[in-house]
Amino acid sequence: MLPYIGHNSYQQHQFPLPEMEIPEKWKLSYEQEAITAPACPRCASSNTKFCYYNNYSLSQPRYFCKGCRRYWTKGGSLRNIPVGGGCRKRSRSRQNSHKRFGRNENRPDGLINQDDGFQSSPPGSDIDLAAVFAQYVTDRSPSSTDNTTGSDQDSPITTTTHALESLSWDICQETDVDLGFYGEFNNLTQKTKEDQEVFGQFLQEDREEIFEFQGLLDDKEIQEILECSFSEEPDQLVSQGSFMINGDNWSSTDLTRFGI
């Protein structure tokens, strides 16, 4: 019986695998790439590394400097990316900014000087715009300089009061022309009312005299007198409304017809 030599014969007749040619740009491993990472173009630090993510082009690989914590691209310009560089690190950067400005030793010199200036300024140095405007108005008004002392002018309450008084004085001056016309009209109306009251008193007296002589006269004569008196009232009312004009002045009611 022949020995079993199938396994050996299979190994002898096995064909060798062909060797594949790998391009040179694929031969560089990640370790070799990390070793050959160039120095940082900003701080010249050799503490740099190759970025495995966010590399959009193999011809221009992206690197990161651990010293200044900035990214740059080989063959390109230096990118001014803040610490972390990603949107996921934004909350951390905000917290760092709050912590950084929470103490004076971590703040810039300009901010420290500004804060010190604001704190060192006395409270009385603040400018009150309302008081300045009131003082400006009082300086322009003619009535604001009367009956004032040095202590009253310094107080903001006094200056505000004078400003309101000057404003009301200007408004009254502007409306004097219109108020003059209305004043003359009111005077004329008042005179007309007084004349009407006087005329009504005379009519009442005439009627009382007629009723006194009622016992001496007949009913027919009394009726004629009453009819004549009432018929003359419209004419008298029209005549009492007539006015005499002498130049530009209005005279009172002409009551010569009534024996005044």
UniProtKB/Swiss-Prot annotation:
PROSITE patterns: ZF_DOF_1 (PS01361), ZF_DOF_2 (PS50884). It comes from the Eukaryota. GO terms for cellular component: nucleus. Keywords: DNA-binding, Metal-binding, Nucleus, Transcription, Transcription regulation, Zinc, Zinc-finger. A zinc finger (Dof-type) spans 38-92. It is found in: Nucleus. Zn(2+) binds at residues 40, 43, 65, 68. Residues 87-101 have a biased composition (Basic residues). Residues 83-124 are annotated as: Disordered. GO terms for biological process: regulation of DNA-templated transcription. The keyword Cell membrane does not apply. One of its GO terms (molecular function) is zinc ion binding. The keyword Transcription regulation applies. Transcription factor that binds specifically to a 5'-AA[AG]G-3' consensus core sequence. This is Dof zinc finger protein DOF1.2. It comes from Arabidopsis thaliana.
